[in-house]
């Protein structure tokens, strides 16, 4: 099973509602379907690292790729639910960043889940029933009871995911670290540690940190 690819972007392709990238790895070209927001980040990138799930079908196999391991692993959890296929799982991830989707499932936010095209009330309820207690390991989170409801505490180092994503997009580690430091100074949302890594405070998700980091990198280069 293919689970990870490192290679050069040849072209971006589109087939109906599905979009993706052709990536060349050791002389072999792989067509990989991606989330729309992932494609938007790949416009200026040549060398890619993708976390991949391989779907086996009667007419062949299909590769679905993600820019970080969290999204790939969450995708695998989603398709383990009865009635949730690969394309519906992609639709859920298109509508909600991984951290928000995990929160919606663990907190039983049926309305948020059904706002995704193709997800009815029964499917949303199955997602909650089957996954509610199976997602905390994905982001190193812990669940605790607070006022009779579940509250999700993030203990993951989101900065590591953002750093990995930006390195995959050909940004230099030095400019990423500089952007992190600037964001730390301006918001105090990132705490510098002895190993010169960063721990994101609770409440700051992947999408927010990625956006803020890119703003600072692009401002510096512009």
Swiss-Prot record:
<dbReference type="GO" id="GO:0048476">
    <property type="term" value="C:Holliday junction resolvase complex"/>
</dbReference>
<keyword id="KW-0238">DNA-binding</keyword>
<dbReference type="GO" id="GO:0005524">
    <property type="term" value="F:ATP binding"/>
</dbReference>
<dbReference type="GO" id="GO:0006281">
    <property type="term" value="P:DNA repair"/>
</dbReference>
<dbReference type="InterPro" id="IPR000085">
    <property type="entry name" value="RuvA"/>
</dbReference>
<comment type="function">
    <text>The RuvA-RuvB-RuvC complex processes Holliday junction (HJ) DNA during genetic recombination and DNA repair, while the RuvA-RuvB complex plays an important role in the rescue of blocked DNA replication forks via replication fork reversal (RFR). RuvA specifically binds to HJ cruciform DNA, conferring on it an open structure. The RuvB hexamer acts as an ATP-dependent pump, pulling dsDNA into and through the RuvAB complex. HJ branch migration allows RuvC to scan DNA until it finds its consensus sequence, where it cleaves and resolves the cruciform DNA.</text>
</comment>
<comment type="similarity">
    <text>Belongs to the RuvA family.</text>
</comment>
<keyword id="KW-0227">DNA damage</keyword>
<feature type="region of interest" description="Domain II">
    <location>
        <begin position="68"/>
        <end position="146"/>
    </location>
</feature>
<comment type="subunit">
    <text>Homotetramer. Forms an RuvA(8)-RuvB(12)-Holliday junction (HJ) complex. HJ DNA is sandwiched between 2 RuvA tetramers; dsDNA enters through RuvA and exits via RuvB. An RuvB hexamer assembles on each DNA strand where it exits the tetramer. Each RuvB hexamer is contacted by two RuvA subunits (via domain III) on 2 adjacent RuvB subunits; this complex drives branch migration. In the full resolvosome a probable DNA-RuvA(4)-RuvB(12)-RuvC(2) complex forms which resolves the HJ.</text>
</comment>
<dbReference type="GO" id="GO:0000400">
    <property type="term" value="F:four-way junction DNA binding"/>
</dbReference>
<feature type="region of interest" description="Flexible linker">
    <location>
        <begin position="147"/>
        <end position="155"/>
    </location>
</feature>
<dbReference type="GO" id="GO:0009378">
    <property type="term" value="F:four-way junction helicase activity"/>
</dbReference>
<keyword id="KW-0233">DNA recombination</keyword>
<dbReference type="Pfam" id="PF14520">
    <property type="entry name" value="HHH_5"/>
</dbReference>
<dbReference type="GO" id="GO:0005737">
    <property type="term" value="C:cytoplasm"/>
</dbReference>
<dbReference type="InterPro" id="IPR003583">
    <property type="entry name" value="Hlx-hairpin-Hlx_DNA-bd_motif"/>
</dbReference>
<dbReference type="InterPro" id="IPR013849">
    <property type="entry name" value="DNA_helicase_Holl-junc_RuvA_I"/>
</dbReference>
<dbReference type="InterPro" id="IPR012340">
    <property type="entry name" value="NA-bd_OB-fold"/>
</dbReference>
<protein>
    <recommendedName>
        <fullName>Holliday junction branch migration complex subunit RuvA</fullName>
    </recommendedName>
</protein>
<feature type="region of interest" description="Domain I">
    <location>
        <begin position="1"/>
        <end position="67"/>
    </location>
</feature>
<keyword id="KW-0234">DNA repair</keyword>
<dbReference type="Pfam" id="PF01330">
    <property type="entry name" value="RuvA_N"/>
</dbReference>
<dbReference type="GO" id="GO:0006310">
    <property type="term" value="P:DNA recombination"/>
</dbReference>
<feature type="region of interest" description="Domain III">
    <location>
        <begin position="155"/>
        <end position="222"/>
    </location>
</feature>
<dbReference type="InterPro" id="IPR010994">
    <property type="entry name" value="RuvA_2-like"/>
</dbReference>
<keyword id="KW-0963">Cytoplasm</keyword>
